Each structure stands twice: as structure tokens, then as C-alpha cells.
């Protein structure tokens, strides 16, 4: 999976290899996943307006750095509902950006739950969901509604989300033959009004790995969207 986030002067890229083991439990399916990550953090100081004197805390050009990381997660689905928990940035790495700057990446804890609502069309469903995120002293709750179109191996998704007192989000994406591509834009609404937000591009690929009985093992993303 490849993820690219840009917020102001800062960029965050993540390259991930993920594996999930699936098995039946209590009439549903439990997935246990692990992920190996390569994080790339960047600061584009050329975009900053620091005045004539300059600011030594901000680089004068674009600098970047990378570190290895890991994530783990659990996912359970039963009938129309699902829930999951995950911990990203298990190693809580410090990324050296350039020669004198550092970016500390704290652990991120996620909880998500949702429900699949059927419509009159066999190809469409509506999925309301909630995600709770905690990272150090920061807590946020995301409320999202997705419309999902599925036909044979094609799946298209359109979503809108709201984070109370913080942001609104729009997302579009699709999956075909195991390749998933999605784009999301989040605009800040805190303060006097809406301001520029951040973009997210995510590309992932899913394939089945048969290590024993058919259908027991699969490789897939455990990242929550």
C-alpha cells in the first residue's frame, strides 16, 4: 500500500506490506493483521514566509528523511456490522529530516465500527460508520457515511464525513481486480470558517495466499479508511 498526505509545509508518505490471517469465530470472521511500514517525512521550507530575518527552526528548502515502522490490528465482522481496533506506529520512530530537523511520530490508536444497510438495488449499499482516534493528547471522532456500488469484481465508493468542531471530508475510490485507489480531501472548519485542508492518496493491492485450506489465508490492507 502507498499513502501520501500533504498538510501545509509537511508531507507524510507511507509504503506498507500487510498480511492478515482470517478465521471463523462466533458466527462471524475475525482478521488479525500486521504491517511493515517505511515512513518518509518531509518539510518544504520554501513554501514558508518567514520574513527577511528567517527562522532557524524552518529549513530554507525541501528536506526529507525515512524510517522503518510497524502496525497491528484486529477486525471482526458478523452479518451486516463490523468493528476493528488498530495501533499504528508501534515503534514510535523519530525521523531525521535533513541534517538538523527531526519529526517524532507518536503511536496512533484507532477504533472503528460500522453497519451495512441494504437498498432496493442489489448493487448499492449505505455504510454509516464511526472512527475514534487517539494520538498522545489528541482525540478525534470521525462520523462517515459511504455509498458503495459493487458489481462483479468492480467496487466504487463515495463518502462524506464530519469531525465535530474540526473538519469535513469527501472521499472517492474504487477497487478492481485487487487494486484499490482512493482520494480524500479534508477541509478544516474550526475557528472563523472553512480553511485549506489536506489531501490523501492511497493505493493498495490485495491478493489471496493459500497456505493450507482454500480461503484460510489472505493478504489485505488492515488500514481503516
Predicted regions and their residues:
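Subset of outer-membrane beta-barrel
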Residues: 1-225
